[in-house]
């Protein structure tokens, strides 16, 4: 397996598991917080998708995120440049749209990511994202994306377990060690 296949398989795996884990959640499950200032599944799902959207825009040197070009910001009742990702408490108040909208954005970003990665070659992984920051390469950006996605997916799994002690990873999405 080469590096591009590994990156692609990692992103597909986390996407399939994420969509399968979130499919069918109720509004209460999306909005439930283990503690008053903790994140809920809806926010984490939005954050993961928004982050992936931004990282793929950077890596591909695209002009704008799907958040703007496809008008997803409107479905979240936001402006193109909001919400401010540095405003942690403001983000907690981000109004969550329906699960369908959340998953729709997630799927659209995944499809864009897959299309981009299918056209990347190994040499491009070592290319800097910008000339003034040589150490930040396309490969580093994609590695960070995979780590970020898996970390936050673990949070969603944990919250699902708190919500329902009989919940387990969807069949076929867990790790099988032989």
Question: Where are each of the predicted segments found?
Answer:
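Short, contiguous alpha-helical
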Residues: 8-12, 16-19, 29-85, 128-178
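Residues within well-ordered alpha-helical secondary structure of globular protein domains
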Residues: 24, 47-50, 108
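N-terminal export signals and maturation junctions of secreted/periplasmic proteins
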Residues: 1-5
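A general secondary-structure boundary signal
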Residues: 24-25, 110, 149-150
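Hydrophobic alpha-helical core bundles mediating ligand binding, dimerization, or RNAP-core interactions
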Residues: 11, 15, 22, 106, ...
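A structural signal for long alpha-helical coiled-coils and helix-turn connectors
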Residues: 22, 26, 118-121, 160
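Acidic/histidine-rich alpha-helical segments that form the ligand environment
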Residues: 78-125, 141-145
């Amino acid at each position: 397996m080469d590096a591009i296949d590994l990156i692609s398989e990692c992103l597909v795996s986390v996407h399939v598991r994420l969509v399968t884990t979130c499919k069918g959640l109720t509004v209460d499950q999306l909005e439930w917080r283990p503690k008053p200032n903790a994140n809920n599944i809806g926010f984490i799902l939005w954050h993961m998708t928004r982050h992936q959207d931004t990282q793929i825009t950077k890596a591909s040197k695209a002009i704008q995120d799907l958040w703007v070009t496809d008008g997803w910001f409107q479905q979240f009742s936001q402006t193109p440049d909001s919400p401010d990702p540095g405003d942690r408490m403001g983000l907690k108040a981000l109004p969550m749209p329906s699960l369908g909208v959340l998953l729709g954005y997630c799927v659209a970003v995944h499809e864009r990511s897959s299309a981009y990665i299918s056209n990347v070659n190994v040499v491009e992984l070592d290319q800097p994202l910008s000339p003034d920051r040589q150490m930040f390469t396309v490969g580093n950006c994609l590695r960070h994306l995979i780590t970020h996605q898996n970390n936050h997916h673990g949070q969603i799994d944990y919250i699902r377990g708190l919500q329902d002690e009989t919940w387990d990873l969807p069949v076929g999405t867990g790790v099988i060690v032989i």
